[in-house]
Amino acid sequence: MRQPWWKDFTIPDASAIIHQNITIVSIVGEIEVPVSTIDAYERDRLLTGMTLSAQLALGVLTILMVCLLSSSEKRKHPVFVFNSASIVAMCLRAILNIVTICSNSYSILVNYGFILNMVHMYVHVFNILILLLAPVIIFTAEMSMMIQVRIICAHDRKTQRIMTVISACLTVLVLAFWITNMCQQIQYLLWLTPLSSKTIVGYSWPYFIAKILFAFSIIFHSGVFSYKLFRAILIRKKIGQFPFGPMQCILVISCQCLIVPATFTIIDSFIHTYDGFSSMTQCLLIISLPLSSLWASSTALKLQSMKTSSAQGETTEVSIRVDRTFDIKHTPSDDYSISDESETKKWT
C-alpha cells in the first residue's frame, strides 16, 4: 500500500529537534530561547485573537438584535441601558485587543530581543484603555444584575432590601479588586513597577480574587432568578397554566448563567489555558442578559396570539414583564369562596 507523503519525513527520535534552542541577538547580548517556548507563545497569540474575534462578532450581532427587536419604551429602561453599555464596552475592548495583538508588541524581537522602540505609542495607549474598560464592563454587568434582582423581588419589600444590600456589597467587592488589579497593571505598563509577589495558582492575588468574586456574584444573582422563576412556574402549574412561556425562557438562561460562568472560572483559574480565555466568563454573561429578554418577548407574543377566552369561575391574570419580573393576580368570580381565597394567598 502506498504510504502518504509525510511518512517520508518521519524520524525515530525527534526530541532533539523539538527541544532545540534558537539564538536571538538582543540588546543585552545573545540569549537562547527554546523552540517550544516560541511555539507556545504564538499559539497563545493565535487562540487569544480567535477568542476576541468571536466576542466582537457576538457583541455586534447581539447589539443589532437588541436595537432592532426592542421597543422604544423598553430602550428607556435602566436594564436596557446597562446591558447595551456592557456590550459596547466589550466590543470596544475586543477591537483594541485585536489591534494590539496584530501590532509589533507581540513580535519575538520585542519580547525576547527587548527592542522596545519597535512598539508604537498608540499600542501603549490601547493597552491602558483595555485595562480601563475592564472595570466598566464589570460595573455595567453588576448594575444590570442588581436592578433585575430588585425587580424580581419587588413583591416583598423586606426581601428586596436584603437582596439589594447583598448585591451592592458584592458589586463593591468585585469592583474593588478589579480596580486594584487595574492600577497594578497600569503602573507596570507605565513605570515597570513590579507586580505583587504574592500569587495564587500563578495569578496575582487581586486578579485571582476578582475573578472568583465575579463568578460568585453571577452565581448568586442567577440563583435568585432561578429560584424565583421556578417558584412562579410551580404556582402557574398549580392553577392550571403551564405553557412554555417567558418565565421558562428566562429560567433556562438563568440556569445557564448559574453553571457556565463557574465552569469557565474554574478552568481558567486552575487549568492554565491561554490569555484570552479569562474574558469568556464576562462575554457569556453580557450576551445572555439581553438575549433572555428577547427570547421571553418572542415567546410572550406567541402566547398572546394563541390566547383564548378564559374559563368561567376564577380568572387568573398572569402579567409577565420580560425584564425578569412577573405579577400574578387573582380576580374572584361571584361564587369565589373565602377558603379558596386563603388557599390562593399561599401561591402568591
Curated annotation (Swiss-Prot):
GO terms for cellular component: cell cortex; cell division site; cell tip; fungal-type vacuole; G protein-coupled receptor homodimeric complex; mating projection membrane; plasma membrane; plasma membrane of cell tip. The chain crosses the membrane at residues 46-69, 79-103, 125-141, 162-180, 207-225, 249-267, 283-301. It is found in: Membrane. It is a multi-pass membrane protein. One of its GO terms (biological process) is positive regulation of pheromone response MAPK cascade. One of its GO terms (molecular function) is mating-type factor pheromone receptor activity. It holds the Pfam family STE2. Its main location: membrane. This is Pheromone P-factor receptor.
